[in-house]
Amino acid sequence: MKTMFILALLAFTATSAVAQLYTTCSQGYGQCQQQPQPQPQMNTCSAFLQQCIQTPYVQSQMWQASSCQLMRQQCCQPLAQISEQARCQAVCSVSQIIMRQQQGQRFGQPQQQQGQSFSQPQQQVPVEIMRMVLQTLPSMCSVNIPQYCTTTPCSTITPAIYSIPMTATCAGGAC
């Protein structure tokens, strides 16, 4: 029962961790710049990987019958709909969520304080987390991930170069 509560708490925590770009305009200049915003579809991927892939066999069988199948669909559908280049950023985002959650569990800290931006300095994602995500997501979702994702550190992959959907939020300026 305690394990189920912890897994449910992890799923809830994962739904508020990844970033998606949106655009804001500085007042008076009308210039836009990209800012991070939660991206729910990648949260589902990290929750799926942590709850359904990394749990012991007996627990994963129980989850598979209920929520794992739904989480897999909610993860794979958006991943299949974005460009191959944007998938590299998505893989980094999922890896960073998992890394931050594991760090928070180790140190007993919350993952992200309310009102904090996701654009804190990017920490290097440990190789084992990145490898697990790169080995699992493409085959699980039947999508291709560019080869350079396996060799390029996440901290150097900027969302600005990829065709990640953006929305404009302009306060006092025109975008």
Curated annotation (Swiss-Prot):
Protein name in the entry: Avenin-like a7
GO molecular function, one term: nutrient reservoir activity
SMART domains from the UniProt entry: AAI
Superkingdom, taxonomy of origin: Eukaryota
Signal sequence, renumbered to the chain: 1-19
PANTHER family referenced in this protein's UniProt entry, alphabetically: PROLAMIN PPROL 14P
InterPro entries noted in UniProt: Bifun_inhib/LTP/seed_sf (IPR036312), Bifunc_inhib/LTP/seed_store (IPR016140), Glia_glutenin (IPR001954)
PTM description: Contains 7 disulfide bonds.
Family to which the UniProt record says this protein belongs: Belongs to the prolamin family.
CDD domains associated with the record: AAI_SS
Keywords attached to this entry: Disulfide bond, Seed storage protein, Signal, Storage protein
Known function: Seed storage protein. Not integrated in the gluten polymer through disulfide bonds, unless incorporated by reduction and reoxidation during dough making. Increases dough strength and bread volume, but decreases dough stability when added into a base wheat flour.
Annotated disulfide bonds: none
